[in-house]
């Protein structure tokens, strides 16, 4: 049995692409905008864990604003990613998650539970267990990071790589 996985490419349009931005503000005193990039009514996205994480951050002194995304066009999603201070992913299951890659492409750091393939490209400090305190710690670590070293997505998430792998697969099927 021959199985191959071709990851979805990150198709953020050029006008939305930005380098990862450092957070600028007063530690544990200023407002942070946390993006929960999904519809909170979807139980597999684990919105409750995101809210608990926000509550812990507020108990530490942060003023937390949590933005959620319901069914939105991609341009609105990318716009929300541009203005957020970080994206928080708490899903119970994901194949990607594509929103993590899109957020990074838009210049917004990601904090995530270890779901899908995030562990293959996110820094270890940005990944936490399914625990609100651990996620709050990861959020603070992410906010502290100056992102001086350029962080980019691996090449296998590019459109060119996707097309090359897809064409190779099609050629093998007809051969």
Describe each PLM feature range.
Residues 1-19:
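Donor nucleotide-sugar binding/catalytic pocket of nucleotide-sugar-dependent glycosyltransferases
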Residues 8, 25-45, 51-54:
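Conserved donor-binding/catalytic core segment of Leloir-type glycosyltransferases
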Residues 79-84:
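Short alpha-helical donor nucleotide-sugar binding micro-motif in glycosyltransferases
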Residues 92:
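Aromatic "clamp/platform" in nucleotide-sugar-dependent glycosyltransferases that forms part
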Residues 109-112:
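Short hydrophobic beta-strand element within catalytic cores of glycosyltransferases
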Residues 144-174:
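A charged, aromatic-enriched C-terminal amphipathic alpha-helix characteristic of glycosyltransferases
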């Amino acid at each position: 049995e021959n199985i191959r996985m071709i990851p979805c490419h990150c198709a953020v349009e050029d006008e939305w692409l930005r380098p990862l931005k450092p957070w600028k503000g007063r530690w544990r005193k200023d407002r942070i905008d946390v993006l929960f990039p999904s519809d909170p009514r979807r139980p597999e996205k684990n919105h409750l864990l995101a809210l608990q994480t926000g509550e812990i951050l507020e108990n530490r002194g942060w003023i937390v604003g949590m933005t959620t995304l319901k069914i939105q066009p991609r341009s609105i999603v990318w716009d929300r990613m541009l203005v957020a201070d970080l994206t928080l992913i708490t899903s119970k299951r994901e194949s990607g998650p594509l929103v993590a890659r899109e957020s990074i492409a838009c210049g917004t750091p990601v904090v995530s539970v270890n779901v899908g393939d995030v562990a293959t490209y996110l820094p270890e400090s940005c990944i936490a267990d399914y625990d609100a305190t651990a996620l709050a710690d990861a959020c603070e670590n992410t906010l502290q990071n100056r992102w001086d070293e350029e962080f980019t997505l691996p090449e296998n998430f590019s459109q060119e790589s996707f097309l090359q792998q897809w064409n190779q697969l099609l050629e093998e099927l007809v051969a």
